[in-house]
Structure formats: structure tokens, C-alpha cells
Amino acid sequence: MQTARPLNILLKPEQLMARPQTIQIFLPAGDPRGIRVAEITTRIIRVIEVPRSQLAEFIKTPESQQVGVYFLMGELSEAGLPRVYIGQSGNVGSRLLQQNLSKDFWNRALVVISLTNSMTQTHALFLEWFAISDAVKAGRYSLENGNNGARPHTPAPLEADCHEIHETAATLLATLGQPVFEPFTNAPTARGEKELFYCKGSGADGVGEYTTEGFVVHKGSRGRLENVASLQGRSAERFREKLIEGGIMVAEGGSVVFSRDYLFSSPSMAAVALQGRHANGWMEWKAANGKTLDEVKRQAVKSAE
């Protein structure tokens, strides 16, 4: 009789059911804007956030000498997206010192290490590759890495470890305000559907979602190319120009087309971008049944009182 072989079933973060978690954030110097250390209390992965101005303090710690993966976070790109560079090193402190001399854009580093110092170079290489791939897929940040390179050869048991490490790191990064791996759009409902809203008229034919962060206009949505006269000289006109300059909206004939999913701070800003005029997004965005976003979301809150 053949011996049964164990199966390595690798689940990505988006495949895991959301569940309550306890996260601890430690402030070594008592400064909430200084170095911060985040952990999920039942796991061995730690994320240390280091302001560039406090890099010298981090270098003095034993954690800086460990194998780890790091994220350099910085100023906005031309497309209006925050920048990130993802790397790994057998000694993260030494590598950050090098990056301090060679890269200008970043102002904070987030370092992923093991509490038990059990992360190996093999782990780090796979984690770097997977993190870059996942960040590109999410599309939230402008990735400063050039080429992701080939998938590194990693034994199946170590790869399983890496997926668990990545899941933990993704949660901790988001907790520290850097949701590098989270998609803009909402997950499907239990019925496998998404709650979509539509903006039509005034040259617009857009699709989007209302999320916890704002309003996401989907890739492929079409909008009006020219602004109406009342928008000229206003901040909204410059806002639309930046979207075009950054390649978020691409001119195509007499229209603009969204080249990617894009998060707006409010439904109204999303409607302005599509229609080229002042607009109340709560009224312009409508569900498939014709109900406005206001009726579906804001009025629902009132009825819950």
C-alpha cells in the first residue's frame, strides 16, 4: 500500500475568510510618528516601520541584522499613486543604509522580519518576488522596482511558509497605513456578486464601487473629454488634467477612458472626473435598479437608526 502524501494547499490572502485578529503596535520611543513595531499576537512575523530620519536608531537594534524583506514608501508618482520599492536582504539594516544613499523618493521603510530569526535567504527571495507580483496585481502603488525577474526555485514546504508570512505581512502593512496588496475593489458578496453603480449621461458611461475608502471607478469606464465652461479655471479642471497627464484617463476620440481602476476620495470627485462638470456623485451614481447611491447607502444608514 502506498503511503499517502501530504498536500500543500496554498491560499492567497484574498482567498482566506476575514476573521477577527488581535494586533499589537509597540512604540519604542513613545512617539506614534516614530518607529513602530506591529505584530499579530499569535504569529511570529513582525513589521517594523522606520522613518528615514530615524534610520540610525533602527540600525543600532539587533533586528536590523536579520534576514528580511523591506518596503520603501515615498512621495506620489505622476499618476497620483504612492511609490513603493520592495527588496530583501540577509542584513536589512545594511541594505537600508545603501538605499539611504542611492534612492531619494522614500521617507519611511517597513521591514518584515521573524521574531524567532528563522527567516532564511530562500524565504526572503521568494517573498520579494511574490510581494512584487502581488503589488502589481493590486495596482495601488507605483512600483519603483524595474524587473520582477523569474520566480525563484523554492521547496514546497518553504513556499507554504512564505505564503503565510506574506499574509501576515500584508495585514500588518495595511494596519500601519500601507495597504500595498489590497485591491481597490470590494470582494464579491456571498452570492458571488459585486455591488456596482453606474454613471451615465453628459458623455459618461462609467462603472464603479463604493468602498470603505471612497469610490473606485473601474478600468474601461468612459468619460467626457472636454470640460464644460463652468469648470474652466477651477480646481476640478486641474484635477482632471492631472488624471490625464498621469495616464489614469486616456484620450480616445472625443472621450477619455480609464486605463486602470482608480480610487477617488468621494463619489462626487469620481463623477466630476467622468462628466467634466460639477456633479453630486451621490445622485449621479445609480445601481442597476435605478436607485441612487444616496438611496442605497446614505438613506440605509438613516433607516437603521
Q: Each PLM stretch: what is its role?
A:
Residues 2-101, 118-126, 130, 168-195, ...:
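GIY-YIG nuclease catalytic motif and its immediate N-terminal context
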Residues 72, 89, 111-113, 219, ...:
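Hydrophobic side chains in beta-strands
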Residues 88-92, 211-214, 300-301:
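A short, sequence-level motif marking secondary-structure junctions
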Residues 101, 132, 136-140, 177, ...:
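Hydrophobic/aromatic-lined pockets within catalytic cores
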Residues 107-167:
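Internal, well-ordered alpha/beta segment that forms a basic, Gly-enriched binding/recognition surface
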Residues 189-284:
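Polyanion-binding interface signature
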Residues 287-305:
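C-terminal engagement modules used by replication, chromatin/transcription, nuclear envelope/ESCRT
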